[in-house]
């Protein structure tokens, strides 16, 4: 028998690990199971066991993958995990190195719930600033729920017991199943369009997450947000929270709790009325007491004890005030009279008749001055004319003719020399007192 061949544990483990690593079926595989022993390391790594009824597997998801998870893994959660199978050499155990994880079944609903909750919160649908006030004394309550469930009976019973005056209108709707969300939305919109109530209670009794899912639908949440009527959400039990609870104006733990929120209790109203009556009575008594003291004070005052003296004093004050008034009135009338005279004089000066009169006066003055200036000018011109005339007369031929001389003309031309005429020419001789027509018989020139 030959010597046996031995391998070390490490070598065998490495060999087995290589077998896992090169197997294409184990490199990228989806595994369905339940989470247990979940431990989240401070660095972000997640260590957990993935199991089913018959087996379990050690698993790990490193931080670079776990930080992308949209939910927090918890024990008992059904999940689908994608990853690769390999061997962890120090322990020799095979384990799953997870790359992706998502809830399975109900877990998927939970994931969708969280995603919608985050989306609507980001849009502000949960903000308190949009919450409407519930009326203190509503006349009509609308209830959107199943007409045959226990919830509607609990709501009606509680409303009538607490506040018999209220009117209850049931708006029947499907509260689970495929068409439930659309049915709930239709009833909410109908109540708003017809304005049939002061408050709406929207809800149902408890159930599984699948049964309550209609109240986690986005269309229901947006219908509640858009409602002009205040809405109380009452879905399931106290531990159940739906998207509708966050959007509604107020959330009640149960349908019965919603009814208690919607209306006051008659007994409480009676007690509040009695308390208010006592406070009003005390306030009236205190007010009347104060007025009584005031009247007593007035009755003991000087005016009530000596009314005639008060009258005489007031009469004296009146006389003094009247005299002051008369003096002020007289002074005022004097000022107004003087002002009126000044205004009258000014207006008369501006009157057309007065202005015409003044214009005539100015015209007459200017005319007289013009005539005076013209006379002076005429006298000056006449004197100058006489002077010039005297000079002209001294030079005028007529003055020469006055001394016995005459002027000879030939054909209207003055003859200055005998050379201008011939014998037989007809001449006109102008004397001082007439004209002679003559014929030249002979011309003789002067000897030089």
UniProtKB/Swiss-Prot annotation:
A GO term from the CC aspect: nucleoid
Keyword Cytoplasm annotated: yes
Any single biological process term in GO: DNA catabolic process
Keyword hit for Nuclease: yes
Lineage start: Bacteria, Bacillati, Bacillota, Bacilli, Bacillales
Function text: Bidirectionally degrades single-stranded DNA into large acid-insoluble oligonucleotides, which are then degraded further into small acid-soluble oligonucleotides.
Pfam families per the UniProt record, alphabetical: Exonuc_VII_L, tRNA_anti_2
The protein's name in its UniProt record: Exodeoxyribonuclease 7 large subunit
